[in-house]
């Protein structure tokens, strides 16, 4: 089931990741149609959306990454998120810097609970991104 702490952001990714870590397979059909109301809960200019996206993603990575990767990736994310907050402030307003900062504060405050939610087995490797985030922020991938 969905992690109730992930209100409206990244809950489906977390669920699929946990299912994979539990040995389940994820299937899809290209014939299905999904209608998504972008910004239906919070629009992209809303700092609360930024907060939820950053906080939920940090928690999701801690819960699902192999232990040996989690520390290094989260440390790297701390640095990247600083740059991302400046970018978001430029694009959507200064309150987004505070939203990213508070996402990190709340993530670290709830660290024991996130660690307790880790499963016994994390699949490694199961995906490959090859600098996807850099391509996105440099404008070549949207």
What is the role of each PLM region?
Residues 22-115, 124, 128-131:
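Active-site-adjacent helix/loop segment of glycosyltransferases
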Residues 5, 106, 133-136:
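Intrinsic disorder/low-structure terminal segments
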Residues 1-33:
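A short, conserved alpha-helix in the catalytic core of glycosyltransferases
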Residues 120-142:
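Anionic, Ser/Thr-rich low-complexity intrinsically disordered regions
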């Amino acid at each position: 089931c969905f992690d109730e702490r992930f209100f409206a952001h990244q809950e489906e990714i977390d669920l699929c990741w946990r299912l994979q870590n539990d040995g389940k397979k994820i299937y899809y059909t290209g014939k299905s149609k999904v209608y998504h109301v972008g910004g239906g809960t919070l629009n992209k200019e809303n700092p609360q959306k930024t907060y939820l996206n950053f906080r939920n993603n940090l928690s999701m990575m801690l819960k699902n990454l192999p232990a040996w990767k989690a520390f290094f990736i989260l440390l790297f994310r701390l640095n990247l998120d600083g740059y991302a907050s400046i970018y978001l402030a430029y694009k959507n307003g200064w309150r987004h810097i505070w939203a990213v900062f508070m996402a990190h504060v709340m993530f670290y405050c709830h660290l024991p609970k996130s660690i307790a939610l880790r499963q016994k087995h994390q699949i490694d490797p199961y995906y490959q991104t090859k600098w996807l985030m850099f391509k996105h922020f440099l404008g070549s991938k949207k």
